[in-house]
């Protein structure tokens, strides 16, 4: 049984979040937690929070054994983009795109 936890509209770009997602996909949960704690990226603590939520959902809501869980899938999708303008010289302005993403972590038993 797959149990998932997701977090939507996180203020991190999907390209940068997918770099971290590739590190702990298909790992055991204990190994994934240690990988995320030692990764120096902005999205690593966000993924750690989602992973802990997925583990808690599996144990409390579905009665699965926490020691047998592994990360079965990690999905990173683009969220809505915030569009801002930065003024420049001679009346010009350039667009700044503040990208967001939707993050999802799925765990299941081996």
UniProtKB/Swiss-Prot annotation:
For this protein, the record's Gene3D superfamilies field holds: Ribosomal protein L22/L17 (3.90.470.10)
**One GO term describing the cellular component:** cytosolic large ribosomal subunit
- GO biological process, alphabetically ordered: translation
User: InterPro entries this protein is in?
Assistant: Ribosomal_uL22, Ribosomal_uL22_bac/chlpt-type, Ribosomal_uL22_bac/org-type, Ribosomal_uL22_CS, Ribosomal_uL22_sf
Cite a single GO MF annotation. rRNA binding
Source species, domain of life: Bacteria
Pfam families the UniProt entry points to: Ribosomal_L22
**Which terms are listed as keywords in the entry?**
Ribonucleoprotein, Ribosomal protein, RNA-binding, rRNA-binding
Report the sequence similarity comment from the record.
Belongs to the universal ribosomal protein uL22 family.
Q: How does it assemble?
A: Part of the 50S ribosomal subunit.
Q: What does this protein do?
A: This protein binds specifically to 23S rRNA; its binding is stimulated by other ribosomal proteins, e.g. L4, L17, and L20. It is important during the early stages of 50S assembly. It makes multiple contacts with different domains of the 23S rRNA in the assembled 50S subunit and ribosome.
Protein name as it appears in the record:
Large ribosomal subunit protein uL22
Q: Gene of origin?
A: rplV
């Amino acid at each position: 049984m797959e149990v998932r936890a997701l977090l939507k509209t996180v203020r991190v770009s999907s390209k940068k979040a997918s770099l971290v997602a590739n590190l702990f996909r298909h790992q055991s949960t204990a190994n994934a937690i240690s990988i995320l704690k030692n990764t120096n990226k902005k999205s690593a603590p966000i993924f750690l929070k989602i992973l802990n939520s997925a583990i808690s959902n599996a144990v409390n809501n579905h009665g699965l054994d926490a020691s047998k869980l592994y990360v079965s899938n990690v999905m990173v999708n683009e969220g809505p983009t915030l569009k801002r303008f930065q003024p420049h010289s001679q009346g010009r302005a350039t667009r700044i795109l503040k990208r967001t993403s939707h993050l999802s972590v799925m765990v299941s038993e081996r």
